[in-house]
């Protein structure tokens, strides 16, 4: 396994403390990797800053060609990446290869094209004798912090728009799941000029803090927890850096009496438990109108009970383990607290799986109330709650009564209601009669404590640029 880091075009070993990297399906240590030192963090940022002088002035065509080459080598090495992701994250191998790798490749190809479509406003005379134009220019060095749930996918979401816009990047993947990012480093070093991409390894305190606080970093992009976002915003406040935050969610799934129940069951069975529920858009907070509540709970419980947890390399496995022992304990604690309320009923699951690895049974909880922690707090595991509601006004208020604002869905056959409710939901994305669908052309990002800024789409590309006015007297 490639375990070296990329700094200024060279693969190097870290000079800091060694950290274990685990296989969550077994609990075994895969390998130990040395963190970068503070001096290596500084070297990576300074390399990126030096490379920006030239990379920031390259043509969109040249940047697009590099991104397309990177997309091609990821596609060519798709099986290798999928196997690394499966071993390091516990993802079913078939899901990593068939679902994630094509989407990752598409992200780089999309932004390769988008790089050539990013324009400022056409020049015009708004003051006699002067011509004004609007430029969209890169910022400089971007520090990107990627999470552990979709390591390579999130690296793509961070790298592609930043590079397409002409920035240079220092990426820190999660210390829990670094292996695909380090493999990416090996392939990217021969495609991009030295310093344009730097990929480090280490924990937040020892590596993340000196990286995000570095005076030459102009922007910090994070996908992670609210707590991590709060820390980075506070840590970087004195230097007034631009920040781009995607901080999780607790997606409301609003199911009206007239919804297609079979479609809801099929959708939640898939989109509530994909990646073992470790997804910030997971369909995890169901509001079911009282007329169909009992039927939905019964049918969904039966469907969830058929989900198969197992070894990641088994073609029949639908759910792998959680990412770490610590996270398994967090998920288990959240469910135990829900059970202790007395009014929440476990329809299926509700316990750790016996044996090796960090497995938690796919769980459906019914009878949850609006103020329950299981409804209000992100669990980030294979746990879905169901709450009954009376009418449209009530459920819209309940759905919006959350600190999160990332994703939501509405299930109804009434087109007018679908538009009406979607317009009132305080979420970055609302799906109607589906959930979880993402495409590179559409923006992904939240409101409230789910953060700000957009990933993917031209809006995502714009987030990595600065708007500048140039006026010429003539």
UniProtKB/Swiss-Prot annotation:
SUPFAM superfamilies: ALDH-like (SSF53720)
Catalyses which reaction(s): 4-aminobutanal + NAD(+) + H2O = 4-aminobutanoate + NADH + 2 H(+); 5-aminopentanal + NAD(+) + H2O = 5-aminopentanoate + NADH + 2 H(+)
Gene Ontology biological-process entries: L-lysine catabolic process; putrescine catabolic process
UniProt pathway annotation: Amine and polyamine degradation; putrescine degradation; 4-aminobutanoate from 4-aminobutanal: step 1/1; Amino-acid degradation
One of the record's GO molecular function terms: NAD binding
Gene3D superfamilies tied to this protein: Aldehyde Dehydrogenase, Chain A, domain 1 (3.40.605.10), Aldehyde Dehydrogenase, Chain A, domain 2 (3.40.309.10)
Catalytic residues in the record: 246, 280
Keyword Oxidoreductase in record: yes
Superkingdom of origin: Bacteria
PROSITE patterns: ALDEHYDE_DEHYDR_GLU
Binding annotation for NAD(+): 146-148, 172-175, 209, 225-228, 280
Subunit structure of this chain's protein: Homotetramer.
Other information: 4-aminobutanal can spontaneously cyclize to 1-pyrroline, and 5-aminopentanal to 1-piperideine.
Family: Belongs to the aldehyde dehydrogenase family. Gamma-aminobutyraldehyde dehydrogenase subfamily.
Name the record gives this protein: Gamma-aminobutyraldehyde dehydrogenase
Source species: Shigella flexneri serotype 5b (strain 8401)
């Amino acid at each position: 396994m490639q375990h070296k880091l990329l700094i200024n075009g060279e693969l190097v070993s870290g000079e800091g403390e060694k950290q274990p990297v685990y296989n969550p399906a077994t609990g075994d240590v895969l390998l130990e990797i040395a963190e970068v030192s503070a001096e290596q963090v500084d070297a990576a940022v300074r390399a990126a800053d030096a490379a920006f002088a030239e990379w920031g002035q390259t043509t969109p065509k040249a940047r697009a060609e590099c991104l397309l080459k990177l997309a091609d080598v990821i596609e060519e090495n798709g099986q290798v990446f999928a196997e690394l992701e499966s071993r390091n994250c516990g993802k079913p191998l078939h899901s990593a290869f068939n679902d994630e790798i094509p989407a990752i490749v598409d992200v780089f190809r999309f932004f390769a094209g988008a790089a050539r479509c990013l324009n400022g406003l056409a020049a015009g005379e708004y003051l006699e004798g002067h011509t004004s134009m609007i430029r969209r220019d890169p910022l400089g060095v971007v520090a990107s912090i990627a999470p552990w749930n979709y390591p390579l996918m999130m690296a793509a979401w961070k790298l592609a728009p930043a590079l397409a816009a002409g920035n240079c990047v220092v990426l820190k993947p999660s210390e829990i799941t670094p292996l695909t990012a380090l493999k990416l480093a090996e392939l990217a070093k021969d495609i991009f000029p030295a310093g344009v991409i730097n990929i480090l390894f280490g924990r937040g305190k020892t590596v993340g803090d000196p990286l995000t606080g570095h005076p030459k970093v102009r922007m910090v992009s994070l996908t992670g927890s609210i707590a991590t976002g709060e820390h980075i915003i506070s840590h970087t406040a004195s230097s007034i850096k631009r920040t781009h935050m995607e901080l999780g969610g607790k997606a409301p799934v609003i199911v009206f009496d007239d919804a297609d129940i079979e479609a809801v069951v099929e959708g939640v069975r898939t989109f509530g438990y994909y990646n073992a529920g470790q997804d910030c858009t997971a369909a995890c907070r169901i509001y079911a109108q009282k007329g169909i509540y009992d039927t939905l709970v019964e049918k969904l419980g039966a469907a969830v009970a058929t989900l198969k947890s197992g070894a990641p390399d088994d073609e029949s496995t639908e759910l792998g383990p959680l990412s770490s022992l610590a996270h398994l304990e967090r998920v288990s604690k959240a469910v135990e607290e829900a059970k202790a309320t007395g009014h929440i009923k476990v329809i299926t699951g509700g316990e750790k799986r016996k044996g090796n690895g960090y497995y938690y049974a796919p769980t459906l909880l019914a009878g949850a109330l609006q103020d329950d922690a299981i409804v209000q707090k992100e669990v980030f595991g294979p746990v879905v709650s169901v709450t009954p509601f009376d009418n449209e006004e009530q459920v819209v208020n309940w759905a919006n009564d959350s600190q999160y604002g990332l994703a939501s869905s509405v299930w109804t056959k009434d087109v007018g209601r679908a538009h009406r409710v979607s317009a009132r939901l305080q979420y970055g994305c609302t799906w109607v009669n589906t959930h979880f669908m993402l495409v590179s052309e559409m923006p992904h990002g939240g409101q409230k404590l789910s953060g700000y800024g957009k990933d993917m789409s031209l809006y995502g590309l714009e987030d990595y640029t600065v708007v500048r006015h140039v006026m010429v007297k003539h």
